[in-house]
Amino acid sequence: MAIRKYKPTTPGRRGASVSDFAEITRSTPEKSLVRPLHGRGGRNAHGRITTRHKGGGHKRAYRMIDFRRNDKDGVNAKVAHIEYDPNRTARIALLHYLDGEKRYIIAPNGLSQGDVVESGANADIKPGNNLPLRNIPAGTLIHAVELRPGGGAKLARSAGSSIQLLGKEASYASLRMPSGEIRRVDVRCRATVGEVGNAEQANINWGKAGRMRWKGKRPSVRGVVMNPVDHPHGGGEGKTSGGRHPVSPWGKPEGRTRNANKSSNKFIVRRRRTGKKHSR
């Protein structure tokens, strides 16, 4: 993938860029693997906003992605197409299995039309192949990693992301996450070899607010520019700092949203670096 820059023909196009979509080989998805996707606009069943800054955007159809691949061990598949998916930053690959079934997977970097991929403990260590962690050598870059055996891929699924397998000890493998966190995962969990493609996604300059609206993202307004009735930081004469430590619109202190006693914390060997210091 490469980035194509627009000429500054309008203020919205000045500095804006877009993917050249050179790796895309098909413009329409496989009909049997598409499901309708109903936009909620950040509302719950009562119509109340539960997630702010969401709504609008272009209509999408959901592509059914195979995040497990454990029922196709030993069955080779040919990459029929590399396709665009509006629901994620990564590209997706349409696989045609030898038994006639078709499935989508996340397209890793280097996978192209016509390649053959496989899954199972005896699969080769090459991009696109899916194996249990116990069968992958240390130092390998992987993506689409399970947190629990058979639970489906949960980690490293976005464009350009990857996890490094540092080593294996007893029934656990040590993984270095994209955040820098080192975590232990059961060696029976499966992962796909390689890093996710479309890494240049992070370098796209969206150029104007309207392109964010096309993606279904609404404006995020700072509390200090609101009125006191709308936010604890609002009001005051002239430009103010908010007058207190940062809080949410409902008065909750900023940050510290995670459960300190989460049961899976025991699998974290080294925490990610957040750049923040919280006193408890």
Curated annotation (Swiss-Prot):
The lineage of its organism: Bacteria, Bacillati, Actinomycetota, Actinomycetes, Mycobacteriales. The keyword Nucleotide-binding does not apply. It comes from the Bacteria. InterPro entries: NA-bd_OB-fold, Rib_uL2_dom2, Ribosomal_uL2, Ribosomal_uL2_bac/org-type, Ribosomal_uL2_C, Ribosomal_uL2_CS, Ribosomal_uL2_dom3, Ribosomal_uL2_RNA-bd_dom. This is Large ribosomal subunit protein uL2. Part of the 50S ribosomal subunit. Forms a bridge to the 30S subunit in the 70S ribosome. It holds the Pfam family Ribosomal_L2_C. Keywords: Ribonucleoprotein, Ribosomal protein, RNA-binding, rRNA-binding. The keyword Nuclease does not apply.
